[in-house]
Amino acid sequence: MQADLDEATKAELKRSELLLMDPSARRNRERVDALLSNNFVEIGSSGRVWTRQATLDLLATEITYTQPQIEDLAVRLLGPGVALLTYRTLRKSMSGEQTITLRSSIWILDSGSWKICFHQGTVAGKSMV
């Protein structure tokens, strides 16, 4: 097994993950559709489980999403054609409350393209800023 991903592949995976956090890209169904694997599942920070179709439907109509601050984005190879991305997001509400969420995504290499097959967000803390 390859010990690590090359820098170009890491950069591609990071770009793709960040694209899914970009408000304008999230509303572009074709763009998101191209990044989600057919069996994509998300466990949101609320604990709700989202299917691929539910995710596509939600993102197409999302109007209040603001891009969070992203920290500590790391990529690790799990096996041939399987990568894990981990990071944390910080999002500040209108009331000044900041939510820290730990996030992880599993990406698979499918017919030469990286696709996200799993994402989970877990709230790690809240504070007033």
Language-model regions, residue ranges each:
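A beta-strand edge to alpha-helix "cap/lid" segment located at domain peripheries
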Residues: 2-34, 39-129
